[in-house]
From Swiss-Prot:
GO terms for molecular function: structural molecule activity. It comes from Salmonella muenchen. Belongs to the bacterial flagellin family. The lineage of its organism: Bacteria, Pseudomonadati, Pseudomonadota, Gammaproteobacteria, Enterobacterales. GO terms for cellular component: bacterial-type flagellum; extracellular region. This is Flagellin.
């Protein structure tokens, strides 16, 4: 080996090995401090790509497990609501069985029907208000897709159904006997509604004249109970003409009039009935809205083919119905043109009136034209058909209404086979509850499977990217020893060129 000074090859070799051991020591320390075998792609390029795919899959499956738990929660929420609906249906069935007993009086049947109506209303409330995170679960038919996997198409569907008295076929459930309207009814501007059994009797013209005073001529009277509960009497003709506040004495069966309080009802109309008359408790009050511009709606009526429509004979009225229990039910707005009423909507805030001119004909085809209040095909008119319940006239397949200015109920029918209908409703609820129970079991199974998959994928990823501490500690110890030895050897290698100096002495 040549003796040279400029190049110390032994020192260079030692430095190179020292650098390698230092790099190995740095890698071992990094892996021990991070716990990962792969801290960057240079550590294991292929392993890093594989581990990253494992990570994406694991994260997706973990979220899918949470999704499945949400699916269980929404199914449990829906099933809980259905349980309450079932409880109400069970009570309705119990009441229907009770109503079938021949010992019930009409008053008993009325009470039973009233509770049935309340129970059905509660079913509708539960159906319309039960929600999960803003999603109404029983208000309409709906399919909720729950993602239970890390890839597209890995889903479980929850089929939700609208559950209400209508979809259960019980919205027209009636356990009362059929009835026929009385001969006499209250008439308000030719809009007639016949119903009810309780009556009151207005006194004769003579009694009314005596109460008002001898100055009245052509006296006629009818007591109309408006929404504020006040009775009024309309007196026509003579110096005493006007509308008076009145009270009705249930004991004496007489109408008493306050002669000091003659109230001009510019916004109300009462129908005159001559002589002694029987008036049902199912009365209609017509209230005219003041200050409403009817020019536009009159033009709409004319455009719809209604002759004689102008702003002077067109007004907005609001019809109210009072059932035999004294409950006032708002019948909605209508446009009065002459003796006819047309369905309309009224914006209280904007003081705007709009005629309802769309209706469905007998073939179910949407048509355009003025919709008369009481029309059998119209979708906008509202009437009260049975006590405590409001329907669209077009929905009443067991009621017959005359179109035009008069609205008259001819008859109502007792529901045939009510227990059979209730049993069918219970079966419908049970079917949906069974489906929800089954889908909860599917979610539980999916969650268990997802947990097993996540565990196995995590183990596989760990073998690829996690540090083996036994190996890395061994590598670190080896690198440290090599560092110490290399440093010592490098010092000796750097002394080799000094041997050449001995040749120069």
């Amino acid at each position: 080996m040549a003796q040279v000074i400029n190049t110390n090859s032994l020192s260079l070799l030692t430095q190179n090995n020292l650098n390698k051991s230092q790099s190995a020591l740095g890698t071992a320390i990094e892996r021990l401090s991070s716990g990962l075998r792969i801290n960057s792609a240079k550590d294991d390029a292929a392993g890093q790509a594989i581990a990253n795919r494992f990570t994406a899959n694991i994260k997706g499956l973990t979220q899918a497990s949470r999704n499945a738990n949400d699916g269980i929660s929404i199914a449990q929420t829906t099933e809980g609501a259905l349980n309450e609906i079932n409880n109400n249906l069970q009570r309705v069935r119990e009441l229907a069985v009770q109503s079938a007993n021949g010992t019930n009086s009409q008053s008993d049947l009325d009470s039973i029907q009233a509770e049935i109506t309340q129970r059905l209303n509660e079913i509708d409330r539960v159906s319309g208000q039960t929600q999960f995170n803003g999603v109404k679960v029983l208000a309409q038919d709906n399919t909720l897709t729950i993602q239970v996997g890390a890839n597209d198409g890995e889903t479980i569907d929850i089929d939700l159904k609208e559950i209400s008295s209508k979809t259960l076929g019980l919205d027209k459930l009636n356990v009362q006997d059929a009835y026929t309207p009385k001969e006499t009814a209250v008439t308000v501007d030719k809009t007639t509604y016949k119903n009810g059994t309780d009556t009151i009797t207005a006194q004769s013209n003579t009694d009314i004249q005596t109460a008002i005073g001898g100055g009245a001529t052509g006296v006629t009277g009818a007591d109309i109970k408006f929404k504020d509960g006040q009775y009024y009497l309309d007196v026509k003709g003579g110096a005493s003409a006007g509308v008076y506040k009145a009270t009705y004495d249930e004991t004496t069966k007489k109408v008493n009039i306050d002669t000091t309080d003659k109230t001009p009802l510019a916004t109300a109309e009462a129908t005159a009935i001559r002589g002694t008359a029987t008036i049902t408790h199912n009365q209609i009050a017509e209230v005219t809205k003041e200050g409403v511009d009817t020019t536009t709606v009159a033009a709409q009526l004319a455009a719809a083919g209604v002759t004689g429509a102008d702003k002077d004979n067109t007004s907005l009225v609001k019809l109210s119905f009072e059932d035999k229990n004294g409950k006032v039910i708002d019948g909605g707005y209508a446009v009065k043109m002459g003796d006819d009423f047309y369905a309309a909507t009224y914006d209280e805030k904007q003081v705007q009136l709009l005629l309802n001119n769309h209706y469905t004909d007998g073939a179910g085809v949407l048509q355009t034209g003025a919709v008369k209040f009481g029309g059998a095909n119209g979708k906008s008119e509202v009437v009260t058909a049975t006590v405590g319940k409001t329907y669209l006239a077009s929905d009443l397949d067991k009621h017959n209404f005359r179109t035009g200015g008069e609205l008259k109920e001819v008859n109502t029918d007792k529901t045939e086979n009510p227990l059979q209908k209730i049993d069918a409703a219970l079966a419908q609820v049970d079917t949906l509850r069974s489906d929800l129970g089954a889908v909860q079991n599917r979610f539980n199974s999916a969650i268990t499977n997802l947990g097993n998959t996540v565990n196995n994928l995590s183990s596989a990823r760990s073998r690829i990217e996690d540090s083996d501490y036994a190996t890395e500690v061994s590598n670190m110890s080896r690198a440290q020893i090599l560092q110490q030895a290399g440093t010592s050897v490098l010092a000796q290698a750097n002394q080799v060129p000094q041997n050449v100096l001995s040749l120069l002495r």
